[in-house]
């Protein structure tokens, strides 16, 4: 629970950037047809969900999100694959830093004190 709160605090640290990206349905379709298969959802259901993400992300396109996570296999996959998908689909760049558990706790505590 404590780690979840720390992770969420780190994930919510947003910064503006001059970054622009192509984002939208063609990118979502490409990810749905490749990395996001197999799925319990049909491709049409996945696309409906992606359309919601695209629309919800529109006001934030061009922003940059800094995420700090513990180095575990799930977070490594998120950092290497899902951050790229998220950026291509939403136009929001993700900087995903992976550290050991103690380093994550220390980094978040330092950030909270500043």
Regions found by a protein language model. Give the residues of each.
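Conserved N-terminal structural module of periplasmic/extracytoplasmic solute-binding proteins
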Residues: 22-114
């Amino acid at each position: 629970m404590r780690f979840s709160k720390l992770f969420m605090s780190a994930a919510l640290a947003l910064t503006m950037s001059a970054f622009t990206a192509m984002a939208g349905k063609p990118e979502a379709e490409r990810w749905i047809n490749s990395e996001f298969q197999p799925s319990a959802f049909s491709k049409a259901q996945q696309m409906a969900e992606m359309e919601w993400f695209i629309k919800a992300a529109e006001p934030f396109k061009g922003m940059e999100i800094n995420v700090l996570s513990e180095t575990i296999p799930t977070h490594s996959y998120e950092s290497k694959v899902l951050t790229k998908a998220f950026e291509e689909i939403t136009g929001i760049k993700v900087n995903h830093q992976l550290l050991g558990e103690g380093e994550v706790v220390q980094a978040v505590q330092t950030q909270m004190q500043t």
